[in-house]
Amino acid sequence: MPILYDVQRIRDGKSFTTRTVNAIQNGEYIFNMSVSFKISEEGLEHQFEMPDVPSPEELKSDREFREEMKDKIPKAMLEGFLRDKPIEIRNVENLNPFDNEKGEPFKNMWIKASGKLPDNHLIHQGVLAYASDMGLRGTSQRPHGFSFGAYEKLQVASLDHAMWFHREFRADEWLLYSLDSPSASNANGFNRGNIFTQDGKLVASAVQEGLIRVKDK
C-alpha cells in the first residue's frame, strides 16, 4: 500500500533549515518527523573516546552467530532469526538475544550494510538511521531479566527516536554501536547509542524512549 509523505517548510535560515514530515497511509497518519539541516563549517570539536572492544574481524560473523544460537531460539521465532538481514551485526558480548538472565544496561555491536552502497552521504545516513533502531530499546530490558525477544512477557514499542549526525561516514563499512540505558521508570526505558568508525571517530548518536510494560499474568 503506497505511503504519502507530506513535507512542511518550517524555517529557512542562513545556516539552518527545518522541515516536518508526515507519512500518511490509507488516510491515516502513521509517522511524523522533525528534521534539521545545517551547513558544514569549522568550529570547536571534542568527542567521547570509543570503547575498547575487539575489532569486528576478531568476532564471529552474523551467520556464524545465528547458526551457533539456533538450537536455543524458540521455534516460532527461528525462521526470522536465521533469515539474512540487510544489516550485518557482530555482537561484542555474544549474548543470546532470547536469554532472560539479568545483565548490565550496556551493549556493544559492530554494524554495517550487507552490500555496497552508492557514494551518496544521504543514502549512508538513511541506512544508519534504519540500523540505529536495532538493539536500542532492548538495552533497557536487560537489568530486569527480559531478553530482546521477550514479547510474550512484555508489551513493547518504540515511543520516540532521535538521531544526530556529527561527522561523515560510510554505512557499508564497520561501525561500532555502543548502547546504554541510564534509566527505566513509569514502564518506559530510556536508551542512548553512540556510533563510531573503526578508527574511533564519533559519527552519530541516537536516543530512544521505549515502552517496556510487563504484561499481566
What is the predicted role of each segment?
Residues 1-217:
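Terminal targeting signals and extreme-terminal segments of soluble enzymes
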